[in-house]
A protein has these predicted regions:
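Ligand-binding pockets and gating/stacking loops
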Residues: 2-356
Length: 356
């Protein structure tokens, strides 16, 4: 499959996000170039198709420099560090800051031909999280919401179908789908899911719920609609979640101290650890955001902190998933709004570069 990825023609970021979403939904991977794949005997049921049951989407907010990470160059554009040899034969080399990922690069595939039409952060984020360009009157669903729409909730799982970690309440959410398909926002992985415990004793809590249901019942009978039903379903699912043993998946304190240290104590590291715990408990789609990639100034200094952190955490996540037998069923995707210019600017940084 890595060979096929390397052979495919240029694709846009929007096309890539649609293919990624389809993969998460159990639809055939990479329909672009499908004729070529069929000619070589690859299809559903053969290696490379249909294994993913979960997605961890690592979004690098700000426009990650591709040259210093996944698509290194030589000469004056390479930056402060020389490219390093990647493990295996399909990738070649990685940016000099990617020492840990180079050791596990035989487990990843790179698409180095993506392009975009926008160099604006907001539009780029929207495309990379929905697969659509922004339109004034429409809010499109996030990829996690699409997964819920097409696949439904995973049977027997009380946890939300999708979560977004380190984002607060920002993001497209359910879009034009019902509220029940909205990803649950986790602003701080150390804190986990907030406001989930009743503020009163159980008897008083149940009395309030019964009273609320009594008030709502006449409204539901008078205004029968999908929107009202979706709101009721959302409330019911929340009640189940509040009583579920699966809530412990949000509690990072249950992880061994050495595992938490290995991921790193920053929010991206702990966010990736939380994502692993959540998919382990049945969550289908977990997005983890990491900001700080808008490196217009002193890109080399910024990469010495941001880049090395991302490298260490990403490699730890891959190894951890593999050790727990989750890597085969989990698609881990990294994306960003756009790349950054090959030329270093007057402030020793790199500017927006949507053609990569």
């Amino acid at each position: 499959m890595k060979t096929e990825l390397n052979r495919l023609d240029d694709v846009s970021r929007r096309q890539f996000m649609l293919k990624t979403a389809k993969t998460a939904l159990g639809v055939t991977l990479l329909p672009i170039g499908a004729g070529r794949l069929r000619a070589e005997g690859t299809g559903p049921g053969t290696p490379g198709f249909g294994k993913a049951k979960h997605v961890i989407y690592l979004f690098m907010e700000g426009g990650m420099t591709h040259i210093d990470t996944w698509d290194p160059k030589t000469g004056s554009t390479k930056g402060a560090k020389d490219p390093i040899k990647a493990k295996g034969d399909s990738i070649g080399s990685l940016g000099g800051y990617m020492e840990n990922m180079a050791k596990v690069s035989d487990k990843i595939a790179l698409i180095r031909s993506m392009t975009s039409k926008t160099g604006v952060h907001e539009s780029g984020r929207y495309i990379m999280r929905t697969g659509y360009e922004p339109r004034g009157t429409i809010v499109h669903p996030s990829m996690g919401a699409w997964a819920s729409h097409f696949q439904g909730r995973i049977q027997g799982v009380t946890l939300p179908d999708s979560v977004v970690i380190n984002s607060g309440n920002a993001g497209p959410g359910a879009g034009f789908f019902p509220p029940s398909m909205s990803p649950i926002p986790i602003s701080n992985p150390e804190v986990g899911l907030q406001n989930i415990n009743p503020t009163t004793g159980e008897p008083m809590f149940q009395k309030r719920i019964s009273l609320m249901d009594e008030f709502d019942s006449s409204f539901r009978k008078k205004f029968e609609s999908d929107e009202v039903s979706a709101y009721t379903e959302f409330y019911d699912e929340t009640m189940k979640l509040m009583k579920s043993e699966d809530l412990k998946a949000f509690d990072l304190s249950q992880e061994p101290a050495d595992v938490r240290e290995k991921y790193g104590r920053d929010r991206f590291g702990q966010g990736c650890l939380l994502a692993r715990r959540l998919i382990e408990h049945g969550v289908r789609f977990a997005e983890v955001q990491m900001g700080g990639w808008d490196m217009h100034n002193y890109v080399d200094e910024a990469m010495n902190t941001r880049g090395t952190t991302m490298d260490s955490v990403f490699a730890t996540l891959i190894s951890d998933l593999e050790s727990k037998g989750l890597l085969e069923s989990t698609l881990v995707v990294m994306g960003s709004e756009f790349g950054r210019t090959p030329d270093i600017n007057m402030n020793s940084g790199r500017d927006h570069y949507p053609v990569a």
